[in-house]
From Swiss-Prot:
This is Tryptophan synthase alpha chain. Pathway: Amino-acid biosynthesis; L-tryptophan biosynthesis; L-tryptophan from chorismate: step 5/5. The active site is at E49, D60. Gene3D superfamilies: Aldolase class I.
């Protein structure tokens, strides 16, 4: 959890926002997935948002569903994902690592056991995509017991009550939704969310990172101009993996070319 705090403090000092890529662990196979993550960090990623392959991903658009299918095809299991997380943490001791998951994967292990395992491998935050704030008590309590930040999604139409709850229960960062619907780079992020950002600040919420539909540097800049602490980009990155599925070296080079200008756009 503390890794987010020190990251945001360092970025503030450097007058930068955070650029956070999302990928699915084990896509397209364990070895290449670890290389992808190293490449994203080398290219300037400030934190990582990682998915564990799950058979029924509700909030994911087709691009990320395909990533899950590729990981399944490679035989990747949740247990192997945790082994990967331990390796990533060993190699990169300071970068914040977040998981984006679904409740079933947490239930399968037992809620407390799941967060204990997160703590053990060095995961900093967990966002359970299909658990709304009002049903989150057992998850967020277990998370805090194990020094893992519970992350909440703030939708564009959030009312005051929801904003207060998110501010009060969330830690690490707040996942600011650019728009309603499923993830995807095709649907570019719409309106700047200054009003939500202002409200979240007023209620002392964890720093907001804008996600969903972030696929170009100008959108990263717009998110930061609207007051967000940074931006999360998933589908656009996973699409690059898909496009170069049979050319592992080209894939890594293309990821670098994509991430560098996205990170550069976070500087004011």
């Amino acid at each position: 959890m503390e890794r987010y705090e020190s990251l945001f403090a360092q970025l503030k000092e450097r007058k930068e926002g955070a650029f956070v890529p999302f990928v699915t662990l084990g896509d397209p196979g364990i070895e290449q997935s670890l290389k992808i993550i190293d490449t994203l960090i080398e290219a300037g990623a400030d934190a990582l948002e990682l998915g564990i392959p799950f058979s029924d991903p509700l909030a994911d658009g087709p691009t990320i569903q395909n990533a899950t299918l590729r990981a399944f095809a490679a035989g990747v299991t949740p247990a192997q994902c945790f082994e990967m997380l331990a390796l990533i943490r060993q190699k990169h001791p300071t970068i914040p690592i977040g998981l984006l998951m679904y409740a079933n994967l947490v239930f399968n292990k037992g809620i407390d056991e799941f967060y204990a395992q997160c703590e053990k491998v060095g995961v900093d935050s967990v966002l359970v995509a299909d658990v709304p704030v009002e049903e989150s008590a057992p998850f967020r309590q277990a998370a805090l017991r194990h020094n893992v930040a519970p992350i909440f999604i703030c939708p564009p139409n959030a009312d005051d009550d929801l904003l207060r709850q998110i501010a009060s229960y969330g830690r690490g960062y707040t996942y600011l939704l650019s728009r309603a619907g499923v993830t995807g780079a095709e649907n570019r992020a719409a309106l700047p969310l200054n009003h939500l950002v202002a409200k979240l600040k007023e209620y002392n919420a964890a720093p907001p990172l804008q996600g969903f539909g972030i696929s170009a540097p100008d959108q990263v800049k717009a998110a930061i101009d609207a007051g967000a602490a940074g931006a999360i980009s998933g589908s656009a990155i996973v699409k690059i993996i898909e496009q170069h599925i049979n050319e592992p070296e080209k894939m890594l080079a293309a990821l670098k070319v994509f991430v560098q200008p996205m990170k550069a756009a976070t500087s004011s």
